[in-house]
Amino acid sequence: IYFGLQTNNNIVTNSKNRSEFDYPVSSTENAENVYEGDAGLSLNFIDRFILGIKEGDLNLAFSANVNSDSKILTNRNIIERAKTLMPYLLYDEEPYMVVNDAGELIWVLDAYTTSNNYPYSQKTTLQLDTLTKLELNYIRNSVKVLINAYNGDISFYITDETDPIAMAYKKIYPDLFAEGNIPSDISSQFIYPEFLYNIQSDIITRYHDIQPDVLYRGDDVWDIATHNTGRVSTKTGTTIEPYYTMVDTIESDESKLGLVLPFTPNEKQNIISYTVGTYENGQPKLTIYKFEADSNILGPMQLDTQIEQDEEISNEIEALNVTGTRITKNMIIVPLNNTLLYIEPVYQEYINEEDSVPTLKKVIVASGNKLAIGNDLEEALQNLVSQYAVNIEVENPDNVDDLIDAIIKANGNLKESTSNSDFEMMGKDIQRLQDLIDRLEKLVEEENNETNNIISNEIVNNTNVIANEVLD
């Protein structure tokens, strides 16, 4: 990676010995690399001297390792590289990398058109850095910037041609923006930008109801949900930050990577809604899922209270809270069709050790009114599902054919409950299927024993007949 987020210095490629340090293979051996890309400037001594003065590094001119074949790679920070070409866009601070079909590493940098003069629109203020604030009431993710991590090639694409600001820039700089669509092997890997999602989430807390009187009175204001991380007061909690997770939505046939954030009614703790930001067919999609007002879906703080009141779980967590350590948690709520799955990993961190890395110790999961804990996610989910497999009334068929039909039906029910992420029915269906299989094994064994007895009796009878005939 020659162009990235932390590549802030100039480098020289194809130096006198050509080989570059790549990574250590052992304590005494290093892997080496030779740059074969097209990026870089081939400069003579005077040009290198001028560049060295500008950059404050005269080694560019006087180093014995720099020769006529050397190339100098400059402006390697991808955000600064984009700003140099197009300074009139607002750039996301968290670009991400994808791999195209050719195996090349490509940075995807989201760019935004903004304005503070859109009529009748709520203003918001962004803290861009310690000293810089940006006030705006219009923002659109209308431009994607693709940067090759190896050779620095950069392309600007307009992804929303209904944005008048973006289209105005295209007319001003017609050669800057690439024509045509973004290659599908790249666009299929787009994710919803968290920077934009945070702005939208803040606005959605107030502007989500289309009824003017409700909006005017402020009767239906939301808060972003909070949770107990173990680092602050358990009464106030910490505001949940958006997180990426695989989501199953009602209108989708397959899981998708989406940004998720739950909301609660103003100054209350139960979940009233959640938003999911996904990319579908190369376009961003933000969906609000709202529960009925009387649904009373548990919020993270309420669930933490239930966890503390669960004797088995609280004892396991307390056993981790030894002197010199700190217990931290991070709740994730995963939408699964028409239900929510709560996942809370529990970490142990040593307080007095420098650079202490939190270690995963337990995972707590919940769905509906059921809680479970395990050493990892798989074990916790198994424990959760097993709680639902109770009080099952089973009518056992009394012959093999009927049992086989019942097993096929039970397996179909299990597939359906699994696809619907219905943990209660999954537990019951698993138990039902296991009972039927056990019953089939027992019935087959009984029939085999009965068959063996019949064969044995026939052999004895035939032997007696033969013996009698011989005696006669």
Regions found by a protein language model. Give the residues of each.
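Long, low-complexity, intrinsically disordered segments
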Residues: 452-472
